[in-house]
Amino acid sequence: MKTGRVIKVSGPLVIAEGMEEANIYDLVKVGEKRLIGEIIEMRGDKASIQVYEETTGLGPGAPVETTGEPLSVELGPGLIESMFDGIQRPLEAIAKKAGSYLTKGIEVFSLNRDKKWHFVPKVKHSDKVKAGDILGTVQETEVVNHKIMVPYGIEGEVITIFEGDYTVEDVVCEIDTKDGVKKVKLMQKWPVRKGRPYAKKLNPEAPLVTGQRIIDTFFPVAKGGAAAVPGPFGSGKTVVQHQLAKWGDAQIVVYIGCGERGNEMTDVLNEFPELKDPKTGKSIMERTVLIANTSNMPVAAREACIYTGITIAEYFRDMGYSVALMADSTSRWAEALREMSGRLEEMPGDEGYPAYLGSRLADFYERAGKVVCLGDDEREGAITAIGAVSPPGGDLSEPVTQATLRIVKVFWGLDAQLAYRRHFPAINWLNSYSLYLDSIGRWMDRNVSEEWVDLRTRAMTILQEEANLEEIVRLVGIDALSESDRLKLEVAKSIREDYLMQNAFHDVDTYSSLEKQYKMLKLVLSFQDEAERALKAGVYLEKITSMVELRDKIARAKFIPEEEMGRIDEIGEELRREIDKLIAEEGVINA
């Protein structure tokens, strides 16, 4: 192919001429150091290229060579437990080759070419196969059984397939198609900007159980759903994302650190290998893929890292796995779009963001979902996309937050005031919402308890009434309230502090199963039922609220381990006995 030459360099944007043979979104190599870039605009023979590496020292006249193929990722065994940069270069391999810093023009294969994987066939000679069918499996980690699928566009009859140890570039199967014999390797490539195909999309119904009480009870996200976590600085977005990555009951986690601090990725690398998955007992790292594109890495690669992450997630979804994708933060990605748009001299939209911000965000979130995968067995897979948004100054009316809210169905609004009061997770229960409540409510009623929806509705009503009553208290004081209204304030305080507050760094409180959440919520609300019974019998509210030891036990129920959940029921029994005793002693006197 003809080689072009650079005529202008503007930060990560390079303009080259003599590129008439290239196509938009082609991958190109720029300069003597062969920096990786991607064509984002074509005008005649001039191409605008966003370069994914530092362009310092690059000048006019430098050669530009097109590869003739789009930016693609390598998909195969070796993805799990790996850490990549925004364009899927393995950071560990780069560190061994070049030290602590990314060297310009360094070329490293995404997947290890030397490691051998044991391949076990699932089909045999002369079987008919088509795109998406599982040819065999590779046990990648103790948790993940990596399924090797027929690549898209191939259909025919298996000629050869053998069990054995192979590298990702070895041919494991030959398929006779109408276009000749096609060789299938353990690895396949896929362009990042193109969604992987599936048979049909399904309606998400089952919840992604996160172990975080405010999320699972009040604002659940379905497996295959999309959620946004907007919040100002210091409100706990990253900790919420880490908690979901640690405890969410997805089988695979893809964590994208997009333009955030390097320390946060270091935390993930240090914590995840030590943490045990409550379902498998194995390290959480054994089901995790990390994509680190920290704030000091080239801006253009931020734009690619979101697509790299979702393509890897789609690959595991196609195997029939439930995948959780965390993007922290989509605001940094939008800022990268804004910078490139400005350098391209495009007409700016709101706050300088490009006019196509909404459609780019939609392209990303719409690749989430629950689907029937390609292949004969009609297996189901799901991607749950959870994006953090960092609005400047916590202003939720800014363009990235508003564009995101138009697309996602779950909104967990983090509140700086709650964070300053040390209430974590700082999700504001009054302005957050989930549009999956009805379908997940039916699932909860069937699988956890028939009372689930009623208890949740009651608790939410109490919290909303508390907000109204606080307005009255501020105006005329608490003495103006009736005893039953003052009781509501006490119960609301108990819901907030004993149920919704959760310590991410406590061994027990960091994760609550659905059964434990149900028992805890029932216990908190049974305090209201029993207290109202006592009020009707003539007991003064002060007598009920002064049952300090019992209320302390209710507050400490969150620290009861999962295997000792029967103790929560015992506290409920004790509560009934104490109220009966109180009615016997006080009720008659005051009646």
From Swiss-Prot:
Transmembrane segments: none annotated. ATP binds at G231, P232, F233, G234, S235, G236, K237, T238. InterPro entries: ATP-synt_VA_C, ATP-synth_a_Xtn, ATP_synth_asu-like_sf, ATPase_a/bsu_AS, ATPase_F1/V1/A1_a/bsu_N, ATPase_F1/V1/A1_a/bsu_N_sf, ATPase_F1/V1/A1_a/bsu_nucl-bd, ATPase_F1/V1_b/a_C. One of its GO terms (biological process) is proton motive force-driven plasma membrane ATP synthesis. Gene3D superfamilies: 2.40.30.20, 2.40.50.100, Bovine Mitochondrial F1-atpase, Atp Synthase Beta Chain, Chain D, domain 3 (1.10.1140.10), P-loop containing nucleotide triphosphate hydrolases (3.40.50.300). One of its GO terms (molecular function) is ATP binding. GO terms for cellular component: proton-transporting ATP synthase complex. Its EC number is 7.1.2.2. It catalyses: ATP + H2O + 4 H(+)(in) = ADP + phosphate + 5 H(+)(out). Keywords: ATP synthesis, ATP-binding, Hydrogen ion transport, Ion transport, Nucleotide-binding, Translocase, Transport. The keyword Ion transport applies. It comes from the Bacteria. CDD domains: ATP-synt_V_A-type_alpha_C (cd18111), ATP-synt_V_A-type_alpha_N (cd18119), V_A-ATPase_A (cd01134). Belongs to the ATPase alpha/beta chains family. Produces ATP from ADP in the presence of a proton gradient across the membrane. The V-type alpha chain is a catalytic subunit. PANTHER family: H(+)-TRANSPORTING TWO-SECTOR ATPASE, V-TYPE PROTON ATPASE CATALYTIC SUBUNIT A. This is V-type ATP synthase alpha chain. It comes from Clostridium novyi (strain NT). The gene is atpA.
